[in-house]
Amino acid sequence: MTSRMAILSGLLFWLLLEWNPAFAYSPRTPDRVSETDIQRLLHGVMEQLGIARPRVEYPAHQAMNLVGPQSIEGGAHEGLQHLGPFGNIPNIVAELTGDNIPKDFSEDQGYPDPPNPCPLGKTADDGCLENAPDTAEFSREFQLDQHLFDPEHDYPGLGKWNKKLLYEKMKGGQRRKRRSVNPYLQGKRLDNVVAKKSVPHFSEEEKEPE
């Protein structure tokens, strides 16, 4: 215990000598030890002595004192991390699984038909739906025929679905007629209804005779 106190006293004296401008003053140079390095060294010694304290979390209003580019990393799904004040708590990488997706997901257990539309850079060889129309009608028909993988239920019509059948079903339906005339702009205009912050316009009928 006496040796620990002697080491701690020596470190404190050395730190005071470095930080006190009355003892020595020299401009900051690249070779000079930074305050962060000193704090890290002191924390490591205190941790070995068994008297380390958790690191101090500064308030949010002191964030403006930071210099240089800053970045925030972390989260539950960014790989292995070490949590806790001393970084000694390893995290567990969670699996992205849902209620309808088995946790032992392998290559022979994929999403049933219909496959999802192909993202950028993918083709039909990757098991996705290529050249899918970007329309509400196609999306509605697609969702009606879509099923998730559920080992507890059996879909008898699962193997009957195919892309050609969906396209034929869409082409056979009635298409929505496109209107070139807005019916809400027809008829006599109401002159007493004006837009906000606009100059009111009165018709010739409402003008008083001079």
From Swiss-Prot:
Keywords, alphabetical: Chaperone, Cleavage on pair of basic residues, Disulfide bond, Neuropeptide, Phosphoprotein, Secreted, Signal, Sulfation, Transport
Disulfide bonds: 118-128
Compartments (UniProt record): Secreted
GO terms under cellular component: extracellular region; nucleus; secretory granule
GO BP annotations listed: intracellular protein transport; neuropeptide signaling pathway; peptide hormone processing; regulation of hormone secretion
Keyword DNA repair: no
Phosphoserine: modified positions: 139, 203
PTM comment, free text: Proteolytically cleaved in the Golgi by a furin-like convertase to generate bioactive peptides. Sulfated on tyrosine residues.
Matches recorded under InterPro entries: Secretogranin_V
Signal peptide: 1-24
Family: Belongs to the 7B2 family.
Quaternary structure annotation from Swiss-Prot or TrEMBL: Interacts with PCSK2/PC2 early in the secretory pathway. Dissociation occurs at later stages.
Physiological role: Acts as a molecular chaperone for PCSK2/PC2, preventing its premature activation in the regulated secretory pathway. Binds to inactive PCSK2 in the endoplasmic reticulum and facilitates its transport from there to later compartments of the secretory pathway where it is proteolytically matured and activated. Also required for cleavage of PCSK2 but does not appear to be involved in its folding. Plays a role in regulating pituitary hormone secretion. The C-terminal peptide inhibits PCSK2 in vitro.
Protein name: Neuroendocrine protein 7B2
